[in-house]
């Protein structure tokens, strides 16, 4: 018969410490980690009056808006605060305006402590500033150059985009491949929602075939060109030089990029991915899936609108969503 006896009093502390370590090691795989991911919107979320309340109520925001007027060479604040929808739709205004609104919100928010970040298309530049990779001035300068380069590319190659609702990604890809014209997937927004990009004739043909294949909607978009497609090659070449000569810093947290839905701590890789973004699809579905797999429990949209929150709920239904 074996009788267990407690250790002598002098050894009780070491015994309990040892027992505690064993229990901790046993429970370690089940430790709950609650990580926050901040996500930044792209073009299309602009609205008249955006940022005006921030300008009037916060000195940090006011200083950043005034600095933006200097960097851009025109008073973007006048268009953002009082411009009409047509003025806001101008590419030279839209992209800097959304970037400004997003980055300034992140700057003035006391709760902004991201564990990881990502941005949809244009929003990737906001994410790079928020993670310390780019300075505010350099980020804004690149966004301005991106907007102008894309506008020129649209003038060279008249083109458009369309939203396809209700078909799986593989079916959309197959239809795009079957068309003897430039038509490619541009935004993998969420399951059952994919935006295609290409020539006007190619998009018209694609919309007809998508509808015949069972798409609930095949909706041409009111945009100036085929973003995230080979037709943006002139803009990619133009922006490449600007990105390569801009100083990039090591990110303070993981930045998930559009072209591969992954993050990198290597500056050269971040630059290469950012250059490729203009002619490559935005892999948003995979980005959110990867962020969730790697610990993100709450996705916080930082910028105008709530479009990204809706996409997250469709991609990762168990995740929490919020906005600032």
Language model features by range: what are they?
Residues 16-19, 27:
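Short hydrophobic targeting helices and cationic amphipathic motifs
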């Amino acid at each position: 018969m074996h009788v267990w006896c407690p250790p002598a009093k002098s050894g009780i502390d070491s015994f309990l410490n040892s027992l505690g370590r064993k229990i901790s090691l046993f429970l370690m795989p089940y430790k709950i980690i609650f990580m926050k991911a901040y996500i930044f919107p792209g073009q299309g979320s602009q609205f008249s009056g955006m940022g005006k309340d921030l300008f009037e109520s916060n000195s940090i925001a006011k200083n950043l808006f005034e600095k933006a007027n200097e960097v851009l060479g025109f008073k973007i604040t006048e268009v953002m605060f009082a411009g009409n929808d047509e003025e806001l739709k101008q590419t030279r205004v839209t992209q800097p305006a959304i970037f400004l609104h997003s980055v300034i919100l992140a700057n003035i928010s006391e709760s902004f402590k991201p564990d990881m970040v990502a941005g949809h298309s244009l929003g990737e530049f906001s994410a790079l500033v928020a993670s310390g990779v780019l300075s505010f001035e350099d980020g804004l300068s690149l966004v301005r150059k991106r907007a102008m380069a894309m506008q020129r590319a649209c003038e060279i190659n008249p083109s458009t985009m369309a939203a396809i609702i209700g078909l799986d990604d593989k079916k959309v890809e197959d239809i795009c491949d079957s068309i003897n014209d430039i038509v490619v997937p541009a935004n993998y927004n969420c399951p059952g929602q994919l935006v295609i990009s290409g020539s006007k004739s190619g998009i018209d043909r694609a919309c007809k075939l998508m509808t015949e294949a069972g798409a609930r909607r095949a909706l041409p978009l009111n945009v100036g060109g085929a973003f995230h497609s080979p037709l943006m090659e002139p803009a990619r070449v133009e922006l490449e030089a600007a990105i390569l000569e801009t100083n990039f810093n090591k990110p303070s947290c993981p930045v998930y990029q559009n072209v591969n839905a992954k993050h990198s701590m290597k500056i050269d890789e971040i630059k290469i991915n950012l250059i490729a973004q203009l002619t490559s699809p935005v892999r948003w579905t995979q980005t959110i899936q990867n962020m969730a797999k790697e610990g993100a429990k709450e996705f916080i949209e930082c910028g105008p609108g709530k479009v990204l929150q809706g996409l997250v709920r469709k991609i990762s239904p168990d995740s929490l969503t919020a906005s600032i």
